[in-house]
Amino acid sequence: MSVLSRISLVALCLLLGNPTAYAADNGLEQLPFVKKMQLAKAGDPDAKMAVAQALESGIDTKADPAMAAKWYREAALTGNYEAQYRLAKLVDKGALGLKADKSTAIKLLDSAAKHGHAPSENLLGQMFQNGDGMSVDLKAAVEWYKKAADQKLAVAQNNLGVMLLKGLGTDRNLDEAFKMFDQAAQGEDGWAMNNLGGMYEMGWGTKKDLDKAKLFYQKAADKGIAISTKNLVRLASLSATPAPASTIVAPSKP
């Protein structure tokens, strides 16, 4: 399989690493659990979120999945969009003792996304792209990826780059795809680093530069992206001669 077919295949997979943490800098992390609980019971949405996280992780208190789910729900109901996002993922998987419910998960994501929560926007984009609980709608996927990418969420920038590279839900635009991969790589997204290496190798959206291709493959490999290590080995074995573009045909679906 040639470099960009690998790139596109891998980059189109759902959940390319965990979405960027989106917790508010509200000082709650420095408080003891007892104080967080006091604030949560007094109605503070962010404190409810902090309590839920502590109960889920078992940090600073004994882990209690059922109570964690309760407080995520409480935080979500009081307008904490990070809580809506996390609760959506839990409900989608049926985690923490919650009943799996795709419809409820989508409603929670939609609520958070419509209020500008970038990870929710990105995840909705993935669900539209893959027909996960809804009909496939590539244009909607692009729209949601763009909203999240505009907020500099690296995983969304990478996902949008793949859509632009492949012409999915939008016109194919190698220049814009390169820009998205570049921005996502600056945001430390490992898959984007791999994809940027591929763009430099092929000369897509930029001047061909095998040294930069190797540089970004190495950066991605250092982040644990296995395919990037293979790309480095392949480049060395090809004596710096990339595969012809005509052989690069990526699948239409992840």
Regions inferred by a protein language model and the residue ranges of each:
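Canonical positions in the second alpha-helix
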Residues: 37-39, 74-75, 111-112, 147-148, ...
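N-terminal leader/linker segments that initiate helical-solenoid repeat arrays
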Residues: 9, 16, 21-56, 254
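Structural signature of tandem alpha-helical TPR/SEL1-like repeats
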Residues: 27-32, 62-71, 98-108, 135-144, ...
